Amino acid sequence: MASYLDFEKNIQQIDEDIINAQIKGDTEAVSILKKNLEKEISKTYKNLSDFQRLQLARHPDRPYALDYIELILNDAHEIHGDRAFRDDPAIVCFMGYLGEKKIIVIGEQKGRGTKDKIARNFGMPHPEGYRKALRVARLAEKFQIPILFLIDTPGAYPGIGAEERGQSEAIARNLYELSDLKIPTIAIVIGEGGSGGALAIGVADRLAMMKNSVFSVISPEGCAAILWNDPAKSEAATKVMKVTADDLKSQGLIDDVIDEPTNGAHRNKEAAAVAIADYVKKSLNELENIDVRELSANRMQKILKLGAYQEA
């Protein structure tokens, strides 16, 4: 059953009317309602606010990493474990083919349904998850296979156990090692890009965001609680924080914005997957013509240009 956000109520009503008309066998009404639905979708999604895009990034029906992996990879095989502590299901790693190209995909997985969400810790990786990602990234470098990172997390897990096992070290180690990989790397924010939890698999030659995704150092709710002592002001915080793909592209913090279907990735997963696959293929065609040592050097220069600072 489809889920709807507050600003999608008109779309929900038309969807329900279409179902009722189909049950009655009223083909003429179905045809008219489908045209009305297209108009309503176009109207609703034409001028989304930053807060509405945040809601879409968290939409319960939005495709997750495993959805895209299933849709874009052929002959996919999962790689488990960090070889030190355990296998963290919040991070998924697959080796397979994108078209005719070998590729490794490393993604953050939130989970669907209560049991799966709990098992995957709602997409909040533990340090062993990031260490698994790094282990697989090293394998990719060893066999000269490019990597696609799919970012979708509210943040790294802040629990006591995670801190005891070195959460900050695991994130820092990934930043250090991924910045110097001698293979082409692409990272795409497909939903939420939550702070260090996203950065830990977000160092890449190309960093892109889906149109309705967000990327920030803290959640808007957390920002509102700190600045105004009122989490309810998250809508205002979302606008101030500049978390959307277009905002980050205009500031030079990401390389590209990947357009979604008009009605959002959650209503057309297949089209969203095609958009991602096309972007990855195009990027790999460009990156594979660059010497791997030059790739690494360019990646480091890109990192050093981030932000603004003044030397003393």
From Swiss-Prot:
PANTHER family in alphabetical order: ACETYL-COENZYME A CARBOXYLASE CARBOXYL TRANSFERASE SUBUNIT ALPHA, ACETYL-COENZYME A CARBOXYLASE CARBOXYL TRANSFERASE SUBUNIT ALPHA, CHLOROPLASTIC
| Major location (coarse) | cytoplasm
Which NCBIfam families does the entry link to?
Answer: accA (TIGR00513), AccA_sub (NF041504), PRK05724.1 (NF004344)
Q: What is this protein called?
A: Acetyl-coenzyme A carboxylase carboxyl transferase subunit alpha
Q: Give the metabolic or biological pathway.
A: Lipid metabolism; malonyl-CoA biosynthesis; malonyl-CoA from acetyl-CoA: step 1/1
Q: InterPro entries in the record, alphabetically?
A: Acetyl_CoA_COase_a_su (IPR001095), ClpP/crotonase-like_dom_sf (IPR029045), COA_CT_C (IPR011763)
* Subunit structure and binding partners: Acetyl-CoA carboxylase is a heterohexamer composed of biotin carboxyl carrier protein (AccB), biotin carboxylase (AccC) and two subunits each of ACCase subunit alpha (AccA) and ACCase subunit beta (AccD).
Q: Does the keyword Nucleotide-binding apply?
A: yes
- Record-stated family: Belongs to the AccA family.
Q: Name one Pfam family in it.
A: ACCA
Function, as annotated: Component of the acetyl coenzyme A carboxylase (ACC) complex. First, biotin carboxylase catalyzes the carboxylation of biotin on its carrier protein (BCCP) and then the CO(2) group is transferred by the carboxyltransferase to acetyl-CoA to form malonyl-CoA.
Keyword Ribonucleoprotein tagged:
no
Kindly give the PROSITE patterns that the UniProt entry links to this protein.
COA_CT_CTER
* HAMAP family reported in the protein's UniProt record: AcetylCoA_CT_alpha
The GO biological-process annotations, alphabetized, read as:
fatty acid biosynthetic process; malonyl-CoA biosynthetic process
Localisation: Cytoplasm
Q: What is the lineage of its organism?
A: Bacteria, Pseudomonadati, Campylobacterota, Epsilonproteobacteria, Campylobacterales
Q: What is its EC number?
A: 2.1.3.15
Record keywords, A-Z: ATP-binding, Cytoplasm, Fatty acid biosynthesis, Fatty acid metabolism, Lipid biosynthesis, Lipid metabolism, Nucleotide-binding, Transferase
Q: Which residues form the CoA carboxyltransferase C-terminal domain?
A: 36-286
Reactions this protein catalyses? N(6)-carboxybiotinyl-L-lysyl-[protein] + acetyl-CoA = N(6)-biotinyl-L-lysyl-[protein] + malonyl-CoA
The protein's GO terms of the molecular function aspect are: acetyl-CoA carboxylase activity; ATP binding; carboxyl- or carbamoyltransferase activity
Q: State a GO cellular component annotated for this protein.
A: acetyl-CoA carboxylase complex
